[in-house]
Design a protein with these regions (language model features):
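Conserved N-terminal segment of class I S-adenosyl-L-methionine
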Residues: 1-178, 187-191, 263-264, 277, ...
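Structured helix-beta-strand junction loops
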Residues: 132, 152, 200-201, 254
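Preference for short coil/turn "hinge" residues that link or interrupt alpha-helices
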Residues: 155, 160, 201, 232-235
Length: 326
């Protein structure tokens, strides 16, 4: 296990997240889907712009933070302490219900087999997959997070980006990218690499924030005047913002076809930082966060109906896709 250290009073999460990004902190890029440079700016957050490609309609952050993945390159102790009671087995993770739901969905298509998780973080999703009988393996570029996942859950974790990891081709039944794909600056390359690692009848499972939901929140914030200062896009770390249509284009361009798509359970992020000044990964007490939880659940159910009728949704916070080789 990781050695536990005392939490300092002025608790700071690991990594390099900034409140504002200057020209020196950011870099311009072409569209990650069609490689064009013809776009319109639709929002600004933390000094970074959210734009929409005029050619393919992909929404992406441009300019984006340089080395955005280093938000997760902090010290082991700091990351460990924000979830230490989970590692001790006395608390659940605030996303455990989400992970169980997502794995049950996966089991509808692949009930067992080799599962490669890309962007494993501290291993919370992968340890659930292991508990549910999958043969698990993970890839995590952050040395700190990979170390925690490896030592805390006895998981096989490669400390690398997927493109660098020494992995066998045509080997995996399932590749998962849960809340990861939106962080990837080169999504086409990642899909191509996933294609080569996947068995002929394998599946890739990808969960991302819903770009249409963020657009709705952005417009609502402007109408109500409450949008200023809100982290709607999380653009300091989210570099691409997918809608059902743009994700489908990205997947099909890499040789995949979309087997299934749906609105997954909403994430109820904890509010400990507001309550006690520290960020922890345990669920917030319902009595202190009930309004936000109920509203998010209401949006989820409305969004699921809307998605079933129209194939897209303004109310579902996230999207989940199961894709297979075409």
């Amino acid at each position: 296990m990781i050695e536990e250290k005392n939490i300092v009073e002025d608790y700071i999460r690991g990594g390099t997240q900034k409140n504002f990004y200057t020209e020196q902190d950011s870099v311009f890029c072409s569209c990650p889907l069609c490689d064009k440079n013809d776009y319109e700016k639709i929002d600004t957050e933390k000094g970074l712009s959210i734009v929409r490609c005029k050619n393919c309609e992909l929404i992406y952050t441009n300019p984006r933070a340089i080395d955005a993945e280093k938000n997760y390159y902090g010290e082991v102790d700091i990351f460990y302490n924000e979830a230490r009671l989970i590692f001790k087995g006395t608390k659940k993770h605030h996303r455990d219900k989400n992970y169980e739901y997502e794995l049950e969905k996966i089991k509808q298509y692949k009930s067992k087999g080799r599962l490669l998780d890309v962007g494993t973080n501290m291993g919370f999703f992968l340890r659930k997959a292991k508990e549910m009988g999958f043969e698990t393996e993970g890839v995590e570029p952050s040395p700190s997070l990979a170390e925690i996942a490896r030592k805390s859950w006895d998981l096989t974790i490669h400390t690398a980006f997927l493109k660098e990891a020494d992995l066998p081709e045509n080997h995996y039944d399932i590749i998962t990218l849960i809340d990861v794909f939106e962080h990837v600056t080169n999504p086409k390359d990642l899909l191509n690499r996933s294609y080569s690692l996947l068995k002929k009848d394998g599946i890739v499972v990808i969960k991302v924030p819903n770009g249409d939901y963020n657009l709705f929140k952005m417009k609502l914030g402007k109408i109500t005047g409450k949008g200023k200062g809100m982290d709607i896009w999380d653009c300091y770390e989210h570099v691409v913002h997918y809608t059902p249509g743009t994700f489908r284009k990205m997947a099909e361009n890499a040789g995949f076809k979309v087997k299934a798509s749906f609105i997954p359970l909403p994430i109820h992020s904890p509010i400990w930082a507001n309550l006690v000044g520290h960020y922890y990964q345990y669920p917030s007490p319902f009595i202190l966060d009930w309004k936000r939880v109920l509203l998010r659940n209401l949006f989820f159910y409305i969004g699921r109906i809307e998605f079933g009728l129209f194939g897209k949704s303004r109310f579902g916070p996230d999207l989940m896709f199961i894709i297979e080789k075409g």
